[in-house]
A protein has these predicted regions:
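N-terminal periplasmic/intermembrane-space "pro-region" immediately following the signal or transit peptide
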Residues: 1-35
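Transmembrane beta-strand segments of Gram-negative outer membrane beta-barrel proteins
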Residues: 31-52, 80-84
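Outer-membrane beta-barrel channels and translocator barrels
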Residues: 34, 75-79, 119-125, 170-174, ...
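Transmembrane beta-strands of outer-membrane beta-barrel proteins
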Residues: 39-45, 84-88, 128-132, 159-161, ...
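Residues on the lipid-exposed face of transmembrane beta-strands in outer-membrane beta-barrel proteins
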Residues: 41, 45, 68-76, 114-120, ...
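Transmembrane beta-strands of outer-membrane beta-barrel pores
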Residues: 45-51, 90-96, 134-140, 169, ...
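Extracellular loop and loop/strand-boundary signature of outer-membrane beta-barrel proteins
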Residues: 54-60, 96-104, 146-152, 200-207, ...
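Residues that define the transmembrane beta-barrel architecture of outer-membrane proteins
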Residues: 62-68, 106-112, 155-161, 209-215
Length: 240
């Protein structure tokens, strides 16, 4: 009697996959590779107009303002040890300035902030962390009724790099708390434009930058109160 070698089957159901005749059926198995990256973001835009009559005894002036902002996040979490958080944030606001005869509009909000934080889990809720943050502004800002520049793109700019620990508390995707403690923090202030006075930004006269070593504490809270209503706050304190 000739014995036939069995064919190599791809995948078999071991439990509950047999037919009524007792034969095992062949089945392909689709394995999904986990995606540890999460991309999210939100934005807003607000427009307001304020009219004050000439007869109003307290005085004042009518204004038109526009405020906008956005936050983009690119985060990595392997659900075991490693976390990487990257964030891009900007705020832009403009307001009309009737009393300013030189400039028709002025900036009321102007911020660009880039941040990154790498964490390796130490114990429950605590991570060894290396963090970096850079912030500056987009547009030039001037004194009222003057062409004297107060601030501009990269003037000033601030860079923070720190090493420390990060405490994280997350509850049911409703509350997200992070407290970053950097005992070792490096800060660099710089002014790129020759038209901006560096002494207004903690930089010595005649210089373009200033380096400082110190510590830094930063706490961020995101709390979803109800659907479509979220509370976000941020606290930062740096020593030198």
């Amino acid at each position: 009697m000739k014995i036939r070698k069995p064919k190599k089957e791809k995948v078999f159901y071991l439990i509950g996959a047999a037919s009524q005749t007792g034969q095992v059926r062949e089945k392909d198995l689709l394995v999904m590779k986990p995606n540890f990256w999460a991309i999210s973001g939100n934005g807003y835009a607000q427009f307001s107009q304020n009219y004050i009559s000439d007869n109003w005894y307290k005085g004042g002036e009518s204004t038109v303002s526009l405020l906008s902002g956005a936050v983009l996040q690119f985060n990595y979490d392997d659900k075991q040890k490693v976390q990487l958080e990257n964030k891009i944030e900007w705020k832009l606001g403009f307001i009309s300035a009737p009393s300013d005869t030189v400039h028709q509009y002025k900036t009321s909000e102007d911020l660009l902030r880039l941040s990154s934080k790498f964490g390796y889990k130490a114990i429950t809720n605590w991570y060894y962390t290396i963090s970096a943050e850079f912030k500056t502004q987009f547009f030039s800002n001037y004194e009222t009724n003057s062409d004297k520049m107060v601030s501009s793109w990269l003037s000033p700019s601030e860079l923070n790099i720190g090493i420390g620990m990060d405490y994280k508390y997350v509850k049911d995707a409703i509350c997200n708390l992070s407290v970053l403690i950097n005992p070792f923090n490096y800060t660099r202030y710089s002014v790129a434009s020759d038209k901006v006075d560096p002494t207004k930004f903690n930089i010595d006269a005649g210089k373009k930058s200033k380096d400082q070593l110190g510590s830094r504490v930063e706490a961020t809270l995101k709390w979803i109160i109800i659907n479509n209503l979220t509370w976000e706050s941020r606290f930062s304190y740096t020593t030198n």
